């Protein structure tokens, strides 16, 4: 499990930068996922590169020893991130490798990844009395226990590289295609632009990411081969054998190259529909890839505006496919395109998976795992905010608002369309009176009012209306998924232990307080789309 802990909320959104958050945020937001991983039996934990309130995580004994091992009960191995022990010198908390090694070891770090600090620094630390042999033995025992569990004493090379048959590789490609298709989020589908009609005979696939198989790998592809990745163009050519697929990149992602805009617009004129593939290069996401501007890089906006303008004049639909590792702030494109898919970086079968969704072989079923911002000034934006004493109120100027933008995200957490059309009704919650040892059952009816079989995701949120500390307006407590044919009805049932209503009290310990809790169920975190019932905690 990594990276422990609070690796995300860095200063100015720059990776590796300092973190300074409240104890409450640490307890409520960042530690629970590690507690769950430990309960599931995770074998190793990696500390973050960052410091938290001035203490580098690699040397943070209070969090690694007291919290992680002592309070959360972690008994496995702690392994440093790449060179992070040596980087304690740059943090300014160690003068040399011996001091750095001593700080990390005393914090509970068992394995030094690539810094050479333990190999070169621990002998000096031991000689200077900075660490004891007993402390070294403690970490050695944890490492040896893990090796024993993995069977490495009997077979040091187990699970080494082995060849795979064509049949096994084929099954892996099939799985990769299915997983990729299920990861595509449809943000917009005006006038049922998608799926593409089976009668389409000329299709323009425009943009620098339309025929870019290597970009489909995304960041951190490690040992992935250069060949064998399917681009959008290749996927559509394979899926539509009777359709002429015309490709024009238009512009590059970053560099100023010879202008292909005219060729792209000619392709639009000749086509019945346009698939516009824009977004980030793979290297713009992942580690050490923070961006200050979250629009389309390079001249892609110029291309997209030209394509959308020409298509509108010609009366032809534009389907925008966004490739990105983060939400891109492109409200102008969302407005002007007829349909919008978020394809992230889908891997080796990306092009085939995108084609499956575009032609309707697969109904999109993924949902946004974040709140999608309208503007940079909204970041960070999330659904679990506290109400504050002056929540937004259009009739009162002295409330929490922007002068130049709406408070709400462009798309709420959990947003995502499909080729079905779903309606939720008849929310039931039992029991109404809930004690700490109870489990509540939440049931909601779902009907597919559309013309295609599709999946709907149902989210379960809670809101504690009155408590000893201000509670978030929404907290995610569970989710379920159901597949329904046209006209079919079904029921989603979710069960929730009442202990899920515990929260961090004013004294920073867990409390279960009596009172009313709202149970909210719906397709996303937009309050207006949620059905609501309530239970009484006692």
Predicted segments, located by residue:
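Glycoside hydrolase catalytic-domain context in secreted enzymes
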Residues: 1-505, 513-527
């Amino acid at each position: 499990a990594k990276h422990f802990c609070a690796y995300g909320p860095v200063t100015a959104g720059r990776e590796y930068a300092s973190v300074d958050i409240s104890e409450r945020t640490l307890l409520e937001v960042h530690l629970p996922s590690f507690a769950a991983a430990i309960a599931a039996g995770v074998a190793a934990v990696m500390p973050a590169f960052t410091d938290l309130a001035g203490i580098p995580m690699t040397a943070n004994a209070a969090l690694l020893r007291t919290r992680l091992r002592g309070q959360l009960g972690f008994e496995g191995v702690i392994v440093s991130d790449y060179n992070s022990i040596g980087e304690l010198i740059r943090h300014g908390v160690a003068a040399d490798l011996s001091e750095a090694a001593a700080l990390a070891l005393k914090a509970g770090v068992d394995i030094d990844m690539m810094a050479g600090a333990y190999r070169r620094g621990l002998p000096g630390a031991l000689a200077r009395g900075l660490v004891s042999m007993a402390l070294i033995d403690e970490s050695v025992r944890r490492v040896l226990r893990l090796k024993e569990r993995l069977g490495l004493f009997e077979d040091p090379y187990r699970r080494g590289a082995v060849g795979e048959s064509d049949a096994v590789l084929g099954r892996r490609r099939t799985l990769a295609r299915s997983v990729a298709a299920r990861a595509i989020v449809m943000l917009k589908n005006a006038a049922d632009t998608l799926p593409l009609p089976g009668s389409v005979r000329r299709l323009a696939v425009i943009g620098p990411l339309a025929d870019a198989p290597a970009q489909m790998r995304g960041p951190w592809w490690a040992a992935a081969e250069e060949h064998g990745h399917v681009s959008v163009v290749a996927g559509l050519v394979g899926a539509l054998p009777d359709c002429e697929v015309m490709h024009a990149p238009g512009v590059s992602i970053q560099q100023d190259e010879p202008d292909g805009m005219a060729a792209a617009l000619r392709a639009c004129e000749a086509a019945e529909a346009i698939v516009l593939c824009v977004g980030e290069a793979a290297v713009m996401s992942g580690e050490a890839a923070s961006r200050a501007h979250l629009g389309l890089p390079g001249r892609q906006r110029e291309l997209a505006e030209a394509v959308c303008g020409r298509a509108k004049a010609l009366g032809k639909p534009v389907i925008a496919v966004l490739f990105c590792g983060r939400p891109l702030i492109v409200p102008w494109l969302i407005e002007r395109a007829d349909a919008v898919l978020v394809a992230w970086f889908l891997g080796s079968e990306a092009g085939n998976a995108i084609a499956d969704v575009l032609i309707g072989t697969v109904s999109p079923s993924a949902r946004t795992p974040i709140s999608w911002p309208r503007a940079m000034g909204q970041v960070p934006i999330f659904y679990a905010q506290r109400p504050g004493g002056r929540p937004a109120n259009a009739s009162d100027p002295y409330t929490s608002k922007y002068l130049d933008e709406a408070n709400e995200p462009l798309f709420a957490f959990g947003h995502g369309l499909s080729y079905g059309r779903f309606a939720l009704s008849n929310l039931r919650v039992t029991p109404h009176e809930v004690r700490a040892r109870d489990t509540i059952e939440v049931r909601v009816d779902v009907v597919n009012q559309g013309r295609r079989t599709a999946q709907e995701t149902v989210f379960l949120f809670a809101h504690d209306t009155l408590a000893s500390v201000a509670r978030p307006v929404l907290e995610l407590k569970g989710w379920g998924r159901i597949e329904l044919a046209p006209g079919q009805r079904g029921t989603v049932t979710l069960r929730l232990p009442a202990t899920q209503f515990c929260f961090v009290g004013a004294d920073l310990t867990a409390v279960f307080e009596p009172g009313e809790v709202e149970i909210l169920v719906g397709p996303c975190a937009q309050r207006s789309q949620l059905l609501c019932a309530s239970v009484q905690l006692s």
